[in-house]
Amino acid sequence: MLPCHMRSSFSMSLLYHAYVYLEFLILACTIYILAPGVYTDKIKWGIHEIDVRPDGNGFWGQRIRQNNPRVDGYELKINPQNESYYLPHPEGGYVQFENMINSTVQDGKLVMQQKSFYHVNDMPDFAKNKVLEEARRQIDAAGAADYKVEWLVSDESAVNQLTEFFKEHNVDIIVTFYPE
């Protein structure tokens, strides 16, 4: 048996090394869980085959780069990890979102000109119906996963118009101002 003074320093050293090892394991697990690019599966989204990893009721996966640099920058501002979140749609296929936080999927809407698709009050009926179609497809996918949908919109006027429009059409989407 070790003398008393040696036992306590030996125990402290052992505890310290166990603590360091535990911290390392926690860090390694966190990096693996959160690391973009560590993909284990593939899904088909439209014409694209996307590398993904399961998370919650959907998948984190590769983000498709946008041709317009402003739109691309806006999406990266919403999710700097350069990934998208994909939810399966109940009727097949997947719905893509820019981000997912606390069971809320987020979709970015960058308004680049006054005559925008998202200034719904100024749009003809066929354009309004396209907005409703997109919103309902997102709600169907999110609802099946027990998630909420939030649109992050870069223009305050569009935020107000979409909020009223969704209220009138009983569309449960949170519309939030999110500047460029």
For each predicted feature, which ranges?
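Residue-level marker of positions within ordered structural domains that often coincide
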Residues: M1, T104, G143
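Hydrophobic, gly/ala-rich membrane-insertion helices/peptides used by toxins and envelope proteins
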Residues: M1-K44
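Active-site or metal-binding loop neighborhoods of secreted/extracellular toxin and effector enzymes
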Residues: I26-V38, K42-E49, N57-I64, N68, ...
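Glycine-rich short-loop/terminal segments
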Residues: L27-P124
